[in-house]
Amino acid sequence: VRVAFDSRAKGDPRGIGRYVRCILEALRETAEPGSVITETQRPRRSDVFHSPWLDGAHLRCPCPSVITLHDLVNLKGRGEYLRTGVRFKLRYLAVQRADRVIVPTQVVANDAQQHLDIDSERITVIPEAADASMYPRGAEEIAAVRARYALPAEYLLWVGGMLHPERRKRVADLAQAPRRMPLVLVGPARPWAHELPDVTLTGQVSDDELAALYSGAHALVFPSDDEGFGLPSVEALACGTPVVACEAPALREVLGDRATFVEVGDMEGLLEAGARALRPAPPPPAWSWADAARATWRVYAAAIAQSHPVSTRRAPRLPRGAF
């Protein structure tokens, strides 16, 4: 099988970059003899094209296409979606035309059916996983990362991108809520995040540093009210750190009884539950990137077997509520 894979997001410090790096490595490790993966955004002379993000979606693709749809947060927030303009509307149309759509949770699958009118037969749920670098670190590594970022002995941790003040992530609400334990925010940040009160920002960190930060935290707090998967929560569990989250449907699907949940929007309750969290944390879900890669290879095979010529595919329509 000749796979064209759009890997442009590989260097992105956010979750999309982690997904691309991990699934690419696992796809190569699980490939059948003779299968070839070419990193390109031009799906020529290929049996199947995989765009692992919305930005790489092709409205007209010369070969069977697979798109990974991580969430539909922008589309569900109708006002935000309308402001994104024609470019994003066309990308959603490209998702509708794809031969197969990969999503990380059944929650996103349901959203894709409801908002994009995608047949359930074309959607495959393939969960994500913690990278192999995410494992409990020893006291020496934890002490080193604490010293490097001037962290206290005990702290609550939040991990994610702070490039834009996304309302659904509730980072500002979290920072402003009363708490009895210091809060550390990890991830790439723009100036607005540096104005948040009484928090420590580490900026972007290496994988080894991130694992040590997870391992040294009292708990990971996850205040989002909407997520597609919530990979930091699985990474934290892999490092032995308890997780406390708001009742976002996808987080509940992924974590089940492995986390403590509070009502959406209850930042004080979230922080208090984080301060009361106890080790040892439950293990993460028993799912690996190798499992995800094998499932993805099966999706490629299905896309190739059931693909229709571009000219015979159903004409796309704008998502519900687009205008």
Across the structure, where does each feature detected by a protein language model lie?
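Carbohydrate transferase catalytic cores enriched for Leloir-type hexosyltransferases
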Residues: V1-F323
